[in-house]
């Protein structure tokens, strides 16, 4: 049976394609960087390229059998499917950051800017704090620099952008990496094919390494 896979476009796509190729999947057409969004060159694996926030939408509607997406999206959106494998790529971390004069222990209600309102709210609830969340889609780093927010919750890999904007990390919330997620019905109908893919990827994925 053919497996249809939703692959996150961009950085995730670039990092995961070598793993898929090493697992024996024909990815040449995707690696050719055309404007195509659907790839059916391998009779056993069909791919669609989508934006990260849309992967779970395709998965939840049963349009695809498998989604490859960052755990940041899984944590922010929530999902009803099976998170089957950490591919150990795209590794970064959620952080709380702000300007050097920020006091995490300040008693006044904090304004927190983020692309991840659910994750930010959960973090501060665990800290016993009631905060106001400001959702931003662009450069979150601007929020504390312009005074619009007290701090930000964002993901970072190396911290370079934070340092270049004179922002300091005050807390690390959780690790982030790329995961393989399987539709519930697909796991019943295509169990053998899915587990064969997972076993192949387990052999070629990078060993887990700390940031």
Swiss-Prot record:
Biological process per Gene Ontology, one example term: L-histidine biosynthetic process
Known function: Catalyzes the condensation of ATP and 5-phosphoribose 1-diphosphate to form N'-(5'-phosphoribosyl)-ATP (PR-ATP). Has a crucial role in the pathway because the rate of histidine biosynthesis seems to be controlled primarily by regulation of HisG enzymatic activity.
GO molecular function: ATP binding; ATP phosphoribosyltransferase activity
UniProt-recorded name of the protein: ATP phosphoribosyltransferase
Keywords, alphabetical: Amino-acid biosynthesis, ATP-binding, Cytoplasm, Glycosyltransferase, Histidine biosynthesis, Nucleotide-binding, Transferase
Gene this chain is encoded by: hisG
Organism: Lacticaseibacillus casei (strain BL23) (Lactobacillus casei)
Enzyme Commission number(s) of this protein: 2.4.2.17
UniProt keyword annotation of Zinc present: no
Main EC class the enzyme belongs to: transferase
Pfam families on file: HisG (PF01634)
Keyword Transferase assigned: yes
GO cellular component: cytoplasm
Catalytic activity field: 1-(5-phospho-beta-D-ribosyl)-ATP + diphosphate = 5-phospho-alpha-D-ribose 1-diphosphate + ATP
Domain remark text: Lacks the C-terminal regulatory region which is replaced by HisZ.
Assembly with partners or alone: Heteromultimer composed of HisG and HisZ subunits.
Annotated pathway: Amino-acid biosynthesis; L-histidine biosynthesis; L-histidine from 5-phospho-alpha-D-ribose 1-diphosphate: step 1/9
HAMAP family: HisG_Short
First-listed, main subcellular location of the protein, grouped into a coarse class: cytoplasm
Localization of this protein: Cytoplasm
Gene3D superfamilies registered for this protein in UniProt: Periplasmic binding protein-like II
Family the entry assigns: Belongs to the ATP phosphoribosyltransferase family. Short subfamily.
């Amino acid at each position: 049976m053919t497996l249809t896979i939703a692959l996150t476009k961009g950085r995730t796509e670039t990092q995961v394609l070598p793993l898929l190729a090493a697992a024996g999947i024909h990815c040449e057409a995707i690696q050719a960087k055309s404007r195509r969004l659907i790839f059916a060159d391998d009779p056993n694996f069909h791919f669609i390229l989508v934006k990260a926030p849309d992967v779970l939408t395709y998965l939840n509607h049963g349009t695809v059998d498998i989604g490859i997406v960052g755990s940041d999206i899984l944590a922010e959106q929530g999902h009803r499917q099976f998170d089957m494998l950490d591919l150990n790529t795209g590794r970064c971390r959620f952080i709380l950051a702000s300007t050097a004069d920020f006091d995490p222990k300040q008693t006044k209600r904090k304004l927190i800017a983020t692309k991840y309102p659910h994750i930010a709210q959960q973090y501060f609830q665990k800290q016993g704090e009631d905060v106001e969340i400001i959702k931003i889609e662009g450069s979150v780093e601007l929020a504390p620099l312009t005074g619009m927010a007290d701090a930000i919750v964002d993901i970072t890999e190396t911290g370079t952008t934070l340092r270049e904007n004179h922002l300091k990390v005050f807390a690390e919330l959780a690790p982030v990496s790329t995961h393989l997620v399987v539709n519930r019905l697909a796991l019943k109908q295509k169990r053998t094919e899915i587990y064969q893919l997972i076993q192949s990827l387990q052999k070629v994925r990078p060993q887990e390494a700390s940031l």
